[in-house]
């Protein structure tokens, strides 16, 4: 069963105390801005639940290390485990490593999400919404700017081992396939691995070709910011280029407030973090949980960005 839950609903359902429980978590990597916000929020939330012991470890973007971490955490006798998976194609291996210990995947969708047993669940946001919201808003902005007869641009992918990156890029092509947006053409797409620095280098390389372009779509804010930094360093007027991304991080909103960033999509770190802990507690107590719990994405533009300050 799939369930969509608002953050307000999750906050309302917050547990203030539990019978003594231990939950362990492993994250793909600590060195990631958005995941840091997610992790910090989870530590804070868990700390407010009496009787709950919560620990988290860094997989350093190493799948083998993460699988060992899952096994080690299980061996410690925890009541449940939360996993932000390194490689979304390795769901079966991670699920097997957890054994009979209740498991909740958070943020990144494992490839075995449709085969999870009753003791496992997935809490995140529906990635079909993320790339679609961003790309469609850029499409509308291009039309409003008089570029509806033809617009060319670039697509920056996240890690190709990550389901979110694959889906967000597919979303872009699905939007371009719509009658309203089929005037958009992708000149080139490459991965910048969610990284601001890699995106800056990639954008600099693209610009060196001398191709004219009207938009840049990125799978996350960090890459969008890197692209913007490269364009500004080259002396481009950001009013001439539409840039869209995903996350609505605080850094991204600062860039948007400066007039350099056009579109992002709020990915609710609080909703995903609290939702994953709540699901882990329920599974640890033998309660049933929906196999997929989705926290909605929300479109963010300069007009409504004030509603999202300090949220991620």
Model-derived regions, located:
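Gram-negative bacterial Sec-dependent N-terminal signal peptides
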Residues: 1-20
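A residue-level marker of the well-folded mature domains of exported/periplasmic proteins
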Residues: 18-312
């Amino acid at each position: 069963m799939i369930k969509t839950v608002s953050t307000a609903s999750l906050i309302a359902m917050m547990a203030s105390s539990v019978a003594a429980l231990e939950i362990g978590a492993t994250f793909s990597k600590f060195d990631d801005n958005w995941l840091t916000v997610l992790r910090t929020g989870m530590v804070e939330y868990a700390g407010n639940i009496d009787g709950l012991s919560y620990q988290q470890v860094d997989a350093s973007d190493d799948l083998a290390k993460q699988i060992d971490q899952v096994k080690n955490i299980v061996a410690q006798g925890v009541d449940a485990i939360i996993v932000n998976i390194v490689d979304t194609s390795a769901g079966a291996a991670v699920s097997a490593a957890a054994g009979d210990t209740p498991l909740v995947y958070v943020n990144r969708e494992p490839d075995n999400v449709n085969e999870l047993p009753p003791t496992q669940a997935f809490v995140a946001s529906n990635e079909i919404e993320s790339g679609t919201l961003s790309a469609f808003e850029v499409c509308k902005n291009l039309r409003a700017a008089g570029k509806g007869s033809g617009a060319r641009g670039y697509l920056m992918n996240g890690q190709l081992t990550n389901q979110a990156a694959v889906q967000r890029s597919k979303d872009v092509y699905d939007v371009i396939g719509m009658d309203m947006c089929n005037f958009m053409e992708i000149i080139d797409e490459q991965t910048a691995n969610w990284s601001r620095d890699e995106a800056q280098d990639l954008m600099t390389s693209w610009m060196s070709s001398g191709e004219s372009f009207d938009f840049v779509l990125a799978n996350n804010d960090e890459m969008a910011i890197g692209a913007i930094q490269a364009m500004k360093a080259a002396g481009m007027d950001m009013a001439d280029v539409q840039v869209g991304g995903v996350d609505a991080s605080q850094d991204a909103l600062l860039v948007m407030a400066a007039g350099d960033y056009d579109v992002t999509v709020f990915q609710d770190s609080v909703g995903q973090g609290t939702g994953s802990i709540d699901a882990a507690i329920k599974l640890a107590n033998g309660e049933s949980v929906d196999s997929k719990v989705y926290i909605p994405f929300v479109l963010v533009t300069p007009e409504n960005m004030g509603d999202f300050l300090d949220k991620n």
